[in-house]
Amino acid sequence: MLRIAIAKGRLMDSLINYLDVIEYTTLSETLKNRERQLLLSVDNIECILVKGSDVPIYVEQGMADIGIVGSDILDERQYNVNNLLNMPFGACHFAVAAKPETTNYRKIATSYVHTAETYFKSKGIDVELIKLNGSVELAGVVDMVDGIVDIVQTGTTLKANGLVEKQHISDINARLITNKAAYFKKSQLIEQFIRSLEVSIANA
């Protein structure tokens, strides 16, 4: 039995779409029909559905053998896991966004402090970072900050709130991670699951 931690929300929707494409229907249908369940079983696999930022913690602590999580989470801090594979879904990017007329940044709101700090330092720009845990766009709309650093997929949310993308920071994609001990103890099961996803170790 493999236990897999999957990030809820947008990334899981992307995973389900990908599973449909490769016709891994048993797992896809199980995830689609989950209702409010957070623990699902199918095909000798147990899925735990958790907040994205918690996926590497469950894997690190040995509560999950495998995790599927966005690279944005892994970029924010170091985890004691095997950061194994790029996955062919979940593509988006980090960006600086602000009102169209904004040209200078003194104060930035973000949920991704490390990413924002690294970016502005690389540009030689001294900014005050305000950490928020949700609705980051609102901070830009009400002028609490000069701009935001957030994840952009289509730009629809930015546009709906009168913000525009100013700078592309870095690309994001889904990653497959494993618990270090499980990678050896359950290597055959893990490799079998990876093959079922039609990805290769060459994607590391």
UniProtKB/Swiss-Prot annotation:
Pathway, per record: Amino-acid biosynthesis; L-histidine biosynthesis; L-histidine from 5-phospho-alpha-D-ribose 1-diphosphate: step 1/9
Top EC class of this enzyme: transferase
Listed CDD domains: PBP2_HisGs
Alphabetically ordered keywords of this record: Amino-acid biosynthesis, ATP-binding, Cytoplasm, Glycosyltransferase, Histidine biosynthesis, Nucleotide-binding, Transferase
Catalysed reactions, semicolon-separated: 1-(5-phospho-beta-D-ribosyl)-ATP + diphosphate = 5-phospho-alpha-D-ribose 1-diphosphate + ATP
Function summary: Catalyzes the condensation of ATP and 5-phosphoribose 1-diphosphate to form N'-(5'-phosphoribosyl)-ATP (PR-ATP). Has a crucial role in the pathway because the rate of histidine biosynthesis seems to be controlled primarily by regulation of HisG enzymatic activity.
Protein name as it appears in the record: ATP phosphoribosyltransferase
Species whose genome carries this gene: Staphylococcus aureus (strain USA300 / TCH1516)
Phylogenetic lineage: Bacteria, Bacillati, Bacillota, Bacilli, Bacillales
Gene this chain is encoded by: hisG
